[in-house]
């Protein structure tokens, strides 16, 4: 087997250079992830994260028997909930227990963690539910920092120390990792413990002890505790137990006995039982309130399987399977150079697994995670970018291996050019080394540019401040943010929300025409309404016409200004463009913002990429003052 047991000590007992390189990588990774913890200024623009904070706040109030705890959020719908610390009988009663979150799309452990930390912090200071972002987001960053370290461990174990260090550096600099670290959601925790479970799988193969299957079960349980997603990990788990069987018979298939298979089966059952136990301990009400658990999981499965079932998934109607996720992860999640490398590395790894035997087991293992996992995800119609996030660390290991393999491949080749034979070690190695340097520098540039998102105020906050400073109080404003986030602090204004996702009817559009005629401004929090309506013309024929007329100026509204916060560094910005994808005309703003010296328009960005921390907020002004009859549906 091509597994290595290098550590950070030299033969002389001194700490090796690799330790200092890894330490530097981790320091850089920590800085990129902890910068801008308060990126939303407390307005909680991520709906899932907000839900976790609010539910943990209500649970804390219920446990503390705080005033009005029974009127808090979800508790209002649970009339039997009993405040205070529960006894055993109350704890086991799903209706009375204050520890039942009554919400299972995500793991209960996330809520319990926040309640635990708040119970400690309340000893020293008063906090509200949204203040827990100062706890949740650093914890998410810490989990992803652990993923950087585990990528090094796995990369070194599979392909050597160089691959481990390069993969750790790429993971530290990957925007998809940096961005997810700024949200208190399950992904960073699940990814970290999934990588730990991969390490435990190899430990089990190498040491061949029952206790190693138990360690594997512990890691698996922690991997699924934040979010139930077990199926893709079964392929690599089956594979490593097959490796165990082959090792016990030294590769002689004919010597495999039923007793050996049965023994390995018991090892696997132990791992599965411990994983289930850990999951149930961290989320006990998935059993005690199994009906709600199955209902929530079923709803999430139906949502992912049917684009357009819920308003926030309409944007995925008719998005091409495989191509969409490859494009979005390459352009926005990793940056184009690294994105190309990691996706190209998949077929190359398959080829090397066939042609070369020295790393074959590692090659088959990483492919067993990435290929079935990606195919499984593409059975869904909804393609949130976060769905492929768990695949990224292993793909980065594969991509790093490919780059360093290219550096060494010159030993097997010679090059002939028209001016004569040259030494391959000088030609191919220099090209390959240059390619490695380019990908590292480009990935680092994009990572630093993305820090701009957290260095400045959120676009919705900037828009709110401008409106409050420049628009007279009490005027009418149309807000096109149905099933979307919001521009905060518009209480001094008469704000009417256009219900775009309600069925298109003449009455709906007549109401809109009346509001447009009487309002002075129209504001979008993000591109979601017009970008998603364009994906379903059969459901929203009138709304699509409204957006076309709005953006081409025929409704008498002109784009006053846009509020953006694109990734930018040294005068180079990376811009997304949802307007073109929606088939709308690009409006010319009355007050254009300053542009960077170099602007890369990278096209449409998935809502997961831009919708939470740097949406494009548009503010239209009613300059035409057209009559309601002119604004009506035509």
Residue ranges: model-predicted function:
Residues 1, 23-26, 238-242, 272-273, ...:
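Signature aromatic-anchored transmembrane alpha helix within multi-pass, membrane-resident enzymes
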Residues 158, 162, 197-213, 223, ...:
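Membrane-interface transmembrane helices that cradle and orient dolichyl/undecaprenyl
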């Amino acid at each position: 087997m091509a597994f290595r047991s290098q550590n950070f000590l030299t033969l002389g007992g001194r700490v090796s250079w690799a330790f200092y390189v890894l330490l530097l990588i981790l320091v850089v990774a920590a800085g990129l992830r902890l910068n801008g913890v308060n990126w939303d200024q407390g307005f909680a623009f991520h709906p899932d994260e907000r839900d976790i904070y609010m539910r943990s706040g209500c649970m804390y109030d219920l446990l503390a028997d705080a005033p009005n705890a029974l009127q808090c959020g979800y508790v209002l719908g649970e009339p039997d909930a009993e405040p205070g610390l529960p006894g055993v009988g109350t704890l086991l009663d799903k209706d009375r227990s204050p520890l039942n979150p009554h919400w299972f799309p995500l793991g209960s452990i996330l809520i319990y963690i926040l309640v635990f930390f708040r119970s400690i912090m309340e000893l020293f200071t008063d906090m509200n539910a949204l203040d827990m972002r100062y706890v949740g987001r650093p914890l998410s960053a810490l989990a992803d920092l652990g993923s950087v370290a585990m990528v090094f461990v796995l990369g070194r174990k599979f392909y050597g120390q160089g691959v481990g260090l390069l993969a750790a550096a790429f993971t530290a600099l990957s925007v998809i990792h940096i961005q997810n670290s700024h949200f208190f959601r399950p992904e960073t925790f699940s990814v970290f413990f999934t990588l730990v479970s991969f390490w435990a799988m190899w430990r089990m193969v190498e040491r061949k002890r029952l206790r190693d299957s138990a360690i594997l079960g512990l890691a698996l349980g922690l991997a699924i505790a934040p979010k139930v997603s077990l199926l893709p990990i079964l392929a690599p788990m089956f594979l490593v137990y097959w490796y165990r069987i082959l090792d016990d018979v030294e590769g002689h298939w004919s010597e495999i006995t039923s007793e050996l298979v049965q023994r390995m089966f018991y090892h696997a059952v132990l791992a599965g039982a411990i994983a289930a136990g850990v999951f149930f301990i961290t989320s006990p009400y998935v059993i005690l309130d199994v009906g709600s658990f199955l209902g929530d999981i079923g709803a999430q499965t139906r949502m992912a399987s049917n684009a357009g079932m819920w308003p926030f998934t309409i944007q995925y109607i008719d998005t091409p399977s495989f191509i969409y996720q490859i494009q979005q992860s390459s352009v926005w999640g990793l940056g184009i150079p690294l994105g190309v490398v990691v996706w190209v590395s998949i077929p190359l790894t398959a080829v090397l697994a066939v042609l070369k035997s020295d790393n074959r087991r590692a090659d088959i293992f990483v492919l067993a995670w990435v290929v079935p996992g990606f195919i499984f995800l593409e059975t869904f119609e909804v393609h949130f970018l976060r769905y492929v996030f768990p695949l990224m660390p292993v793909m980065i290991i594969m991509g790093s291996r490919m780059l360093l393999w290219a550096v060494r491949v010159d030993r097997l080749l010679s090059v002939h050019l028209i001016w004569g034979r040259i030494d391959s070690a000088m030609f191919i190695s220099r090209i390959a080394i240059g390619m490695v340097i380019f990908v590292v520098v480009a990935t680092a540039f994009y990572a630093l540019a993305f820090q701009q998102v957290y260095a400045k105020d959120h676009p919705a906050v900037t828009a709110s401040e401008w409106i409050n400073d420049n628009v007279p109080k009490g005027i009418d404003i149309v807000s096109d943010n149905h099933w979307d986030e919001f521009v905060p602090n518009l209480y001094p204004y008469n704000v009417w929300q256009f219900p775009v996702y309600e069925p298109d009817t003449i009455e709906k559009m007549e109401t809109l025409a009346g509001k447009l005629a009487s309002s002075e401004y129209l504001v979008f929090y993000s591109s979601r309404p017009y970008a998603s309506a364009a994906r379903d013309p059969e459901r929203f024929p009138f709304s699509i016409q409204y957006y076309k007329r709005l953006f081409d100026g025929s409704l008498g509204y002109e784009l006053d200004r846009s509020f953006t916060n694109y990734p930018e560094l040294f005068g180079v910005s990376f811009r997304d463009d949802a307007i073109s994808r929606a088939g709308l005309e690009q409006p010319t703003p009355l007050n254009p913002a300053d542009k960077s010296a170099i602007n890369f328009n990278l096209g449409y960005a998935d809502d997961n990429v831009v919708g939470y921390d740097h949406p494009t907020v548009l503010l239209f002004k009613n300059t035409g003052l057209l009559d309601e009859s002119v604004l009506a549906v035509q």
